[in-house]
Design a protein with these regions (language model features):
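Intrinsically disordered, low-complexity segments enriched in glycine/proline and serine/threonine
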Residues: 5-6, 41, 48, 55, ...
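C-terminal motif of bacterial Sec signal peptides marking the signal peptidase cleavage site
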Residues: 16-20
Length: 372
């Protein structure tokens, strides 16, 4: 099975569906979770709250102990700057991810939070100076290398601090979370609170992300006691320098899966993808509205245009939901063994091919990573 999963991960590097330069996998059982810095955690007043528009899926019948699975994605590009003669231009991405399981009373049962930081630099001629083939690690994946302790003298590294916040959220409703140890005015843990001893970074943005994930949660098959996993594959290799014929492009591709599992079997799954594009011209001037919301493919829905412009049998969000539903109840080996064509589309005549016609090799790689 390990050889098969390794093969699928290799295939993903060549598949356009999911970019996959780097990423992370976080697993939560009774919630030992990872969570944003003050820069990336922005309240809804300044950055649109993460409103992950969940595609319509046929949810399994609920049963005693049934939980809802939710994901929220919020992207901030407001710190991006144009190039000048004195300083390079930079498109700065900070993507906050929150995943939860929640019961029908709104009580959070498990929580994972992560963040994807990425930067694409370019000069005042619109030429990219960054290595766009370099890995794009999440903050949890960076761990100590993120440098909050070494360079900032923090009491703990970013991943440890956000893990404390995610742990704190478990067993609470959103309202209880907002009215507990976190001062939603200052955004910090209240002085003297238990949380203040383990988390000193700005936290309010993470609370908003958790709230969005709870609001987006739906019954997809998760049960009490299942492990919650958040996995990503990220890259900026689609970026391109500006020319006389075409605008420059900084593009962060982030492919995201949240799933629950028990005894090696997927019990619920939700997949989304982000293509965050910022254009600049041959003078290094950014031409994209940095205040405009950056939506995921699920949030775009019909506006993504696969049906209208490509004549697809269904929109991207519907096909991703169909794939997620299809693999629920399967093991990692089952998913890796799904029959595909040379272009990694579902094999002709298969059950999956009737609802999914996009390439799924990247999906398989993402799930393989989540199930490691």
């Amino acid at each position: 099975m390990k050889k098969t999963i390794a093969l699928i991960l290799t295939i993903a590097m060549a598949v356009a569906t999911l970019t996959g330069c780097a990423g992370t996998t976080v697993v939560i059982g009774e919630c030992t979770c990872p969570c944003v810095t003050e820069d990336s955690a922005v309240a809804p007043e300044t950055t649109p709250a993460a409103t992950e528009a969940a595609p319509e899926v046929a949810a399994p019948e609920t049963a005693s102990g049934a939980l809802k699975t939710g994901l929220a994605v919020s992207t901030n590009i407001s710190k991006s700057v144009s190039a000048t003669a004195e300083a390079a231009g930079a498109v700065e991405y900070d993507v906050t991810l929150a995943a939860v399981t929640v019961d029908d009373n709104g009580v959070i049962q498990s929580c994972v939070i992560d963040s994807i930081p990425a930067t694409v630099n370019f000069d005042n001629k619109g030429v990219i100076t960054s290595d766009i083939t370099a890995a794009v690690d999440t903050k949890n994946e960076k761990g100590e290398a993120y440098g909050m302790v070494a360079w900032g003298g923090a009491i703990a590294e970013w991943d440890a601090q956000v893990a404390a916040v995610a742990d704190y959220a478990v067993g609470k409703t959103v309202e209880e979370l907002k009215n507990g140890d976190i001062d939603m005015t200052t955004g910090k843990a209240k002085d003297g609170s238990d949380l203040s001893s383990s988390a000193t970074i700005y936290l309010a943005g993470y609370v908003y992300a958790i709230e969005a994930a709870v609001n987006n949660a739906q019954h997809l098959g998760a049960q009490s006691g299942d492990e919650l996993v958040l996995a990503t594959m990220n890259g900026v290799k689609s970026s391109a320098s500006a020319t006389a014929e075409a605008a420059g492009l900084a593009q962060l591709d982030a492919d995201i899966a949240v799933l629950t599992r028990k005894d090696g079997v997927i019990t619920s799954c939700y997949i989304d993808s982000l293509q965050a594009k910022v254009n600049f011209d041959v003078t290094g001037t950014i031409t994209t509205d940095l205040a405009a919301p950056v939506q995921t493919k699920n949030e775009l829905g019909e506006a993504y245009g696969m049906v209208a412009w490509g004549g697809a049998i269904a929109e991207w969000d519907e096909q991703a939901a169909s794939f997620a539903r299809y693999i629920t109840g399967k093991t990692a080996a089952d998913v890796a063994g799904i029959a595909i064509t040379e272009t990694t589309k579902p094999a002709d005549g298969s059950d999956l091919a009737s609802s999914v016609t996009i390439s799924i090799g990247g999906f398989q790689a993402l799930i393989a990573k989540a199930m490691q």
